[in-house]
Amino acid sequence: MEKRNQKKRQQNAHLSCELCRERKVKCDKLDPCTNCASAGVVCVPVRRPRLPRGAHARRLRRISPEDPEASIRIDISPGAGTAADEDLKKRIRRLEALVDSMRSSASQSSNQDQESRDAIESISNETEDASAPTPDSSRMPLGDGGLRVLGLSGPSNLEIGWASIIEDKETTTQLCQVYLLNVDPVIKILHRPSVERWMLQGERYLGFPERHAAVESLGSAICYVAATSLTETQSWARFHATKSSIVARARRACEAALEKSSPLVSPEVTTLQAFVLYLVARRSEDPSRAVWTLMAFAVRIAKALDLPGGADETFFGQQMRKRLWLTICLLDFQTSLSQPSEPLISVVEATASFSPPRHINDSDFSLTTSHDIPDREGLTDTTFSMVSYHVQVAGRLLNFEPSVGDYETRQQHVQQFEQRTLRLLFYCDPESTPYAWFTWHRIQCFVSGARLSAVRPLRHPRGGSTSCMIPLTGTNESAGPLSLALNVLEKVQLVHTDPRGEGFRWFVTVPWRALAIAISECYVCQDRALMQRAWPIVEAAFQQHEAAVSGSSKAISTTLERMMCRIREKLSLTLGTSAITASPTFGITSIATTLSVPHTPPSQSSITSSGDLLSNWPWPATELSHPGPDLALVAGVAPISSSLPKLDPLLHSLDNQLVIAAQEPLVDADQSWAWEEVMASLHHDETIGADMFLS
C-alpha cells in the first residue's frame, strides 16, 4: 500500500520553473531554484503530472474520445497559469503558420528556416513532455491539383537553381532539337511545325498567352523526354555533362511545371499532352511501377476531356485529339504488359474508339486548316505511330480478349493487322533516313510479335485453368515460336548496335515475353544447330534485360533467372562446357559480330533478293517466288486471296506475306509445358509479392 501511494505522489513532477523556461537554461528544480535566487526574482515553480510521450501518446489519442484539438490543461502556481497558457498558445499558432507556409512553397529561405527552428525549439522547451499538436489537414493548400500526393514534386528540399535548365534558352533549344529527332517520330502527339516556331523561333504556341501554365508544362515535358532519349555520347557532345545529371534537372523542372498547371483539373488538352510526355519519359527512365500507377490518371483525364468521342470543330484539333487518345491507349497497353494486370481501357472500348488520324505529314496542315486532307502514300511523319496504334489494338485482341480463344480467330486478327500495317511500308526505302530504317525493322519486329501472340498468348490462368496456348510442332524447327522470338530479340539488338538506331534506342527494350518464349523453347528444342545459333542471342538478351530492370523488377527476373539456370545445366551436357562458359561473358558490345542479322546497310538492288525483308520468310508465294532466309515461319500455309495494290520493287514480294499460317495446331506436351510454367510462375509471383516486371 505504501509503495502505491508513493508512486501516485511521484506522478506530480516538479518541472522547470517559468523563468528558466523563458531563459532556456537548466533549472535545478529547487523551491526557489538557484537561478531565480541569484537573479533576485520570484521563482514560479511548475508541478503537474508528466504527459505520455511517443507511442504512448499516439495510443492515448486513438483511444481517447476527447477532442484532439482541446487545449492542454497545465496546473501551475496561482497567478502565473494564465500568462503561461496564453504564451504557449501563441507559440503553437506561430508554429502552425510556419508549417503551413513551408508546405505551400517548394523552397524555403534561410531566415524562414532559422525562424522555424527557433519556434520548434521554443515549443519543445515550453511543453517539455507534451506532444506537439499537428495542424489540421483540411487547412493544407490544395492549389497544386493534388499532384503532391502522387509524388510528382519529389523531395521538398530541392536545390537552388534546379529550374535553370528550362530558363537557359540555349539548353532548351538543343533539347527541342533532340526531341524533334529522337522522340517526335515515334511518339506523335504534337504538331512539329508549331513546336519549331514556338521553341526554336520564339513565337507564341497555338495562340496561348505568354508564360501560360499549360504551355510551360509542355515545354518542360519536351525537355524531359528529350533528355531521357539521349545516349551518354550525345549528352557529352551536346551539353558536356552526363545524361543522368541532365535528366535529373529536366525531371525536377517538369514536375514543378506540372504542379503549376494542375493536370488533374485543367481543361486544356495541352496540359494532358505534357502529362503524357512526362509518363513516356518516366517510363524510359524509371522501370518501377510508378508509370503503371499514374496511367490511371491519364486515362481518367482523357475521358474527362472527351478525347475518345469528342468532335472538334477544326481539322487540326481533330488530329491532335486522335493522336493523343491513341497514344494513351498505346501506353496503357504497354504498361499492362509490363505489369501482371489487364489494360485499364477495355478491348471493347479500345476497338470502338479506334479512329486513327490521317496518314500525312505535319507540314500538310496547320492550325487554320479548314478542309479535310486525304492520306498519303509512302513514309510520312505519322507512319510509325500509325503502326503502333494498330499494334495496341491487335495486342489487346490477341492477349486480353477471352472470346478470342480459338487459333483460327487469332489467325484472322493477325492477318488483318499485317494487311493494315504492311500497306504503310509501300515505297519505304530503309536506306533513305534513320527514321525509315528504324520503321522498317520495327514493323518486322511487330509482325513477329503478333505472330507470337497468336501461338503464345499472354493470358493469366484463372481458377486453376491453363492458358489458351497453341503449341506448334513440325518437321521444320526453324518455323516455330523459337525463330519468331529470336527474330524479335535480334531486331532489338540491331537497333542497339547499328548507328542508325542511336536516336531511338531509348524507345526499344528487350521484351520480356519474347525472351521468356525463347528460353522456354530452347529448353525443349532438339535441334543442335538451331540451339547453337539461338543460345548466344538468348544469353545476350537476358543480360541486357537484367541490366535494364536491375533492382526494380523481381517477379520476371526471378522467373527468367531460374529458367536460365536450368537451361544452362542442360546445355552444358548437350552443347559442351565451352559453349556455356562463353555465353555469360557475351557482352552487349559484341552482339553485332555474333547475330545473324546483317549490320551493314543493304543495297537497293539486294533488298528484293536476299536482304532483311519481311518477304524473305519461307512461306509459299502465290504470285512471286522470292523467299529468303531471314525470318522463318510455319511451312505449309494457305495462300491469301487479297487484292492489294502492286508494290514498289523495294517491297516486291511483300503482298504474299499478309497471312499467318493456316495449319491445324498440333499438341505436343513436351514443347508446351515450358511456356505454361513461365505463366504459372509469374502468376504465383503476382499473388505473393508486389514486385512487378518490365516489358
Swiss-Prot record:
Top-level taxon of the source organism: Eukaryota
Keyword Transcription applies: yes
Coiled-coil intervals: none
Annotated region described as Disordered, given as residue ranges: 101-146
GO cellular component labels: nucleus
Descriptive protein name: C6 finger domain transcription factor nscR
InterPro entries: Sec_Metabolite_Reg, Transcription_factor_dom_fun, Zn2-C6_fun-type_DNA-bd_sf, Zn2Cys6_DnaBD
Upper taxonomic lineage: Eukaryota, Fungi, Dikarya, Ascomycota, Pezizomycotina
Composition-biased stretches (Low complexity): 101-113
DNA-binding region: 17-43
SUPFAM superfamilies named among the record's database cross-references: Zn2/Cys6 DNA-binding domain
Compartment list: Nucleus
One BP term from GO: DNA-templated transcription
One Pfam family hit: Zn_clus
Function text: Transcription factor that specifically regulates the neosartoricin B biosynthesis gene cluster.
GO molecular function terms noted in the UniProt entry: DNA binding; DNA-binding transcription factor activity, RNA polymerase II-specific; zinc ion binding
Alphabetical UniProt keywords: DNA-binding, Metal-binding, Nucleus, Transcription, Transcription regulation, Zinc
